Amino acid sequence: MADVLSVGVNLEAFSQAISAIQALRSSVSRVFDCLKDGMRNKETLEGREKAFIAHFQDNLHSVNRDLNELERLSNLVGKPSENHPLHNSGLLSLDPVQDKTPLYSQLLQAYKWSNKLQYHAGLASGLLNQQSLKRSANQMGVSAKRRPKAQPTTLVLPPQYVDDVISRIDRMFPEMSIHLSRPNGTSAMLLVTLGKVLKVIVVMRSLFIDRTIVKGYNENVYTEDGKLDIWSKSNYQVFQKVTDHATTALLHYQLPQMPDVVVRSFMTWLRSYIKLFQAPCQRCGKFLQDGLPPTWRDFRTLEAFHDTCRQ
């Protein structure tokens, strides 16, 4: 290391220059001490002035002498060679200004976004691997030529079993009334009334929930011929939102081997809307956002969230 530093540098002159710097600092300090002390130790004013001027001139001459000596030695020191390696310290001058090139913040944001995308993709992959998109008990990935064509088990349950499951669910929730009808044969249709908050039309095939429509408590749910209206939407945006969330819940609660558990889980989730207009958002703490109450209910905790706060 010493050999690298000594290239092109007179070390003896360098040492003398350091001593000259110290001498120059001492001379400058004496000048300021002289100015600070002022005129002293003389009886007459004229004598004090002459002594002060003489002492001040001597100090200035000392400063001038030491400065000339330092300039002379600085010429003898020489310049270090520019070829010695700086290693990583040579890259310090290449660092960009944070205000002009916010590269770090952009990379950090991209990294967080990529992490979040990977996390949600993993969750979606796990759910899709567990649940068949056909909502049947058939195994996925088997060639259609090799497996027999089986009827899904959820579509061949006897009506008595379906009635018994719905009756038990109706008794589980006192604030929820369920009216079952079969206007088109064996397929059941449910009219679920949740307190005085809303009504839900549930179209079923055996114990498989095919469609849900949520409407307000005072809205008409029947057509002109007295049948349940399974096509028209609610006139209120809040219940249209709840209908969309209920459709999402149908895709979430899927277990083809245990269809009664699926229906009970969906009804438990639907029951959480009993406080649709009373529960605040668990994230922002507000009751209204864009004129709407918290319409989303978490599938596990059943906590209320606004549609924009749940993400």
Curated annotation (Swiss-Prot):
Q: What does the record give as the function of this protein? A: Component of the Mediator complex, a coactivator involved in the regulated transcription of nearly all RNA polymerase II-dependent genes. Mediator functions as a bridge to convey information from gene-specific regulatory proteins to the basal RNA polymerase II transcription machinery. Mediator is recruited to promoters by direct interactions with regulatory proteins and serves as a scaffold for the assembly of a functional preinitiation complex with RNA polymerase II and the general transcription factors.
Give yes or no: UniProt keyword Cytoplasm: no
The identity of this protein, by name, is: Mediator of RNA polymerase II transcription subunit 27
Gene Ontology molecular function: any one: transcription coactivator activity
The scientific name of the source species is Sus scrofa
Localization annotation: Nucleus
Family, similarity comment: Belongs to the Mediator complex subunit 27 family.
Residues where Phosphoserine occurs?
S132
Keywords of the record: Activator, Methylation, Nucleus, Phosphoprotein, Transcription, Transcription regulation
